[in-house]
Regions:
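Active-site and adjacent substrate-binding regions of carbohydrate-active enzymes
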Residues: 1-194
């Protein structure tokens, strides 16, 4: 947590959900149907693991890792539609809980929207192909934050989601420049204070 995070948040109960494995249906609607039970457990905040589409290229297993994100600005269609996600977040709020989502900004899937449209924003191996700095993460390509246009894109994406959710859990945050996070916090606070 950031230094200026409200102390009361440090004692909140988080309930983590990976939508794909949460129920047999693996959908936003199935999570929504279970919210009363989750609330009764004393939950204050629901933390959703990545909600975005998973890449196809170099998948780990048949389903792939949810941290190999194909499009930061979309929801995984296996989980439902964007409207289904909005309904879930509204239902969470209706029960007095908050919702946070995972933000995976160090890397994407190698066949992501960003890799297709902005390959220059990625780390490249000596042979020129997209790569990552960790050998066992073969299903992802690392982003290169020396490109300020990438900062703009990522911050706009955070602001988009901040209009829906209450906050973010930032995966491998130390691998993304601290200055990026400082700027992102300032800009997101203009959309969702606190």
């Amino acid at each position: 947590m950031a230094v200026d995070t409200e102390k009361t948040l440090r004692n909140q109960v988080l309930y983590s959900i990976y939508v794909r494995n949460y129920s047999e249906a693996g959908t936003f609607a199935a999570v929504q149907a279970d919210l009363d039970r989750i609330k009764a457990l004393g939950t204050d905040i629901i933390w959703l693991l990545p909600i975005h589409p998973t890449g196809e290229k170099h998948r780990k297993g048949t389903l792939g890792s949810p941290y190999a994100i194909r499009d930061y600005r979309a929801v995984n269609p296996e989980f439902g539609t964007l409207d289904d996600f909005r309904h879930l977040v509204d239902a969470i709020h209706d029960r007095g809980m908050k919702c946070i989502i995972d933000v995976v900004y160090n890397h994407t899937s190698p066949d992501s929207w960003l890799a297709e449209h902005h390959p220059e924003w990625f780390f490249h191996k000596p042979d020129g192909s997209l790569g990552n700095r960790f050998g066992d993460w073969w299903d992802v390509a690392d982003l290169d934050y020396s490109h300020k246009e990438l900062w703009e894109y990522q911050i706009e994406t955070l602001k988009y989601w901040a209009r829906l959710v209450d906050g973010f859990r930032c995966d491998v945050a130390p691998l993304v420049p601290l200055e990026f996070w400082k700027r992102a916090r300032e800009e997101v606070a203009a959309v969702r204070p606190g």
